[in-house]
Amino acid sequence: MNKDMWKLSPKNIAALGIGSAVFVIVGRFASIPSGLPNTNFELVYAFLAMIAMIYGPTVGFGVGFIGHVLLDLMMYGQTWWNWNFAAGFLGFFIGLYALRVNIDQGEFSAKEMVIFNVVQVVANAIVWFLLGSVGDMVLNSEPAAKVFAQAGLTTLMDGLTIAVLGTILLKLYAGSRVKKGSLHKD
């Protein structure tokens, strides 16, 4: 377990700031409308998954939350706190799995990819249904049918985005790292 993933070291603070900015940019320019109101196909969640896997739950939460707040303010002039927290907790839950994987040491096996995708699908369902939908019903008096439709589509789209693009990004990242024990002194 990499205990540095829990700390707000200068490296993690930089990752938090840069990651939040990238979240806003990708969220702004790589968002495809789904046809369901206020629900888009968001490529940014593959980036969030990658950041959470590299830097852990603290940075994952921060990038998801801060990035989503800034994106909402930029796009709509207001924010929906329950959905912002949902994005943050998505990064947090994926980051928790990162504590069990040595991706910085070039390890991301097929088994780890499968577990990663199970984790992210479950995390997507939890955050979008519980925090997003239930939050909208409680805080904004939104109709259940509407918010559960949004949560279902969001879970499906974000889960697929992370499964395909997120897994590819993580495999490429792991492949760029020097594997532990691969360098030998001659």
Curated annotation (Swiss-Prot):
Subcellular localization is given as: Cell membrane
- Where does this protein chiefly localize? membrane
Pfam families, alphabetized: ECF-ribofla_trS (PF07155)
Q: Which UniProt keywords apply?
A: Cell membrane, Membrane, Transmembrane, Transmembrane helix
Q: Lipid biosynthesis: is it a keyword of this entry?
A: no
- Where do the TM regions start and end? 13-33, 46-66, 79-99, 114-134, 150-170
Q: Give the membrane topology.
A: Multi-pass membrane protein
The identity of this protein, by name, is UPF0397 protein Ldb1710
